Amino acid sequence: MGFSDGASYALSLGLTNGDLFTHVIAFSPGFMAPASRRGKPPVFVSHGTHDSVLPIERCSRRIVPQLDRAGYQVRYREFDGPHTVPESIAREALHWFSSNEGTADVDAPGDDGI
């Protein structure tokens, strides 16, 4: 889980190590740069429509379709606001995580022959 640059790192590390993480939560990410992808943890992404720090058009509105095309289960929420995490979005993300609404495709250790 992360916000802003922390969300970018959460996406990058969570997708690279999807065999270790059951879920990824990214609040207002700027990019994702996974080295390689293992597993398919479900992903929660949110972004403010008035974000001037990491504009939604250049960030989440590009990231989410890439995740969809790659076969990830994504819950995406846009909200009317700036570069922040509204309480309602944080609560929704925590509910999503704690209720196991997303079921991760996690590889068991050793499945890849390593």
Residue ranges and their predicted role:
Residues 38-43, 72:
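Short, proline-enriched alpha-helix->beta-strand connector loops that line the catalytic pocket
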